[in-house]
Curated annotation (Swiss-Prot):
Keywords: Ribonucleoprotein, Ribosomal protein, RNA-binding, rRNA-binding. One of its GO terms (cellular component) is cytosolic small ribosomal subunit. It comes from Shewanella sp. (strain ANA-3). HAMAP family: Ribosomal_uS15_B. It comes from the Bacteria. Belongs to the universal ribosomal protein uS15 family. This is Small ribosomal subunit protein uS15.
Amino acid sequence: MSLSTEAKAKILAEFGRGANDTGSTEVQVALLTAQINHLQDHFKEHIHDHHSRRGLLRMVSARRKLLAYLKRTEAARYNELIQKLGLRR
């Protein structure tokens, strides 16, 4: 259920600050968002997959914490990121 290497590379190129930037908050949030969207599609077909749903909730929680950190430290980058990802806040 993880993202393909190509999908991750595309996200890194779009949201990363450099070629090897995998740890910045923006990249982490973008990767989590892609995984969350992938799991949401999975749940449309597999409604009773509660084990994966627990993982989804953990990802949503981690993304929420990262977004709160980014909003607290650098509000301009936060606003730009949620606009790019199409998240509502």
